[in-house]
Amino acid sequence: MATTNSSSQLTGNLALMPVSNHDRVFGWSQHAALWFSLGVGLLVMQIGAYLVPAVGTRDAAIAIVLGSLIGAGLLAWTAKLGCDSGLTSAGLMHATYGSAFAKLPVLLNIVQLIGWTTFELVVMRDGTAAIGKQSFGLDLSGFGGMVATTAIWGGVLCALIAASMLTTVRKLIGRFALPLVIASLLWLTWQFGGQIAAKGFDAFWTRPGNGSMGLFSAMDLVIAMPVSWLPLIADYARHGKNGKSAMSGTWLGYALANIWCYALGVMVVSVATPGTDLVTALLLAQGGLIALGLILFDEIDNAYGDAYSGAVSSHSLLPNWSIRQWGLLIVVACTVLALFLPMHSLEPFLLMLSSVFVPLYGVILGRWSLNATSVNTTQKSVDVTAAALWIAGIVLYHVMAKWAPQWGAALPTLAFTFVLAWLTRPQSARALQAV
């Protein structure tokens, strides 16, 4: 169990204190259900559809399976650290980088989470408009329609944020949303799988790419999705009953969902008419309206996950506001931003911003993952070594992406920061790991 400094206790900063045993209620099934649900999304399918023209079906499948297993494994490893230490993501950043310097990655995380929450609201709004036009002849693309649909989804998200996170995960996601989204994925797989079989599996499997991307670059793109969840997974995993179930449940749940949704994107682009967007292709499938509606409904938990974690991180900086109050403010702000920001144009920026969290968590895992009981938030204001390793990792990531894309950027950066962070870990951590 992690230790915390007295100032956090006195100010009631729940984001920097280890979670109480009373709130450790998630078992294996809750971890698996949550991260399967969060692994499902239209953006994942869109990236899967993007891979095929670049690398071909066979290499896309390899990149999807390996990238998902590695990315989900990294998520699961971080989940175990969060569960064993009882700390939030912000708490882990404070313990690793120092109380003053940690504010920088915490702020970057808040910016990322606000961006992703806004993006999810746009996805749900646009999906609702597509369903309305395709199925009912309603034109919701005007400003009035945009305001109405965005406000409806924002209102649903506010209601979820106002409720208990523990209840939302255990009852709404685990018992209600998960079975419905699995049913929709099974139906879409059956529909598009049947079309592929009718056209011939060999032609589908041997489709070549145009060479615009290599296998490792494709894996980086796949890994980018689970990596985008790294800065918030501890906010949920710390409520687990034990680290092993948090790790295995997260790994299996997220990897399965990620592979499935990427594969669906590959299947859709392989049978759809050229130029048809993903949402339209899904709607044109038999039963696609219901299936897409269920997937859109599932998008709300992605937005919830981002907004709740953004609230936890914000509370860590300004604890005078509760996590619930921060959550409501973030949702309202994101609902307004969804009306004005060109979120589809900002999507590459959000993925790029996610790249800074590969070295960030390489350092965190290198410092603490081998003995989470040594984690504490009584660090100095700046851990110069950890900060330097993170910055060096960011530089390495972008150098690799630009000048050696054939080797990928995520895995070399993760290995570099992890090894150096482990070698330079504090003496207290060395002593505990030696016991």
Question: Can you say where each PLM-predicted feature lies in the sequence?
Answer:
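Membrane-interface "cap" regions at the ends of multi-pass membrane proteins
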Residues: M1-R58, P208-A218, R238-S245, R425-V435
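C-terminal membrane-solvent junction of multi-pass transporters and transport-like membrane proteins
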Residues: P18, Y361-L423, Q427-V435
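Hydrophobic, membrane-embedded alpha-helices of multi-pass small-molecule transporters
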Residues: W28-V44, T189-I196, W205-V268, L283-Y304, ...
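Membrane-water interface regions at transmembrane-helix termini and the short interhelical loops
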Residues: A54, K80, L104, A130, ...
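Juxtamembrane transmembrane-helix boundary signature
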Residues: I64-T96, L107-Q112, T118-L121, R425-A431
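Hydrophobic alpha-helical segments and their helix-loop junctions in multi-pass secondary transporters
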Residues: L121, R125-A129, I161, P179-W205, ...
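Transmembrane alpha-helical segments of multi-pass small-molecule transport proteins
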Residues: Q134-S164, P179-W187, G214-L230, A255-L256, ...
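Membrane-interface loop-to-helix entry segments
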Residues: T149-F192, M247-Y254, L350-G362, A410-F418
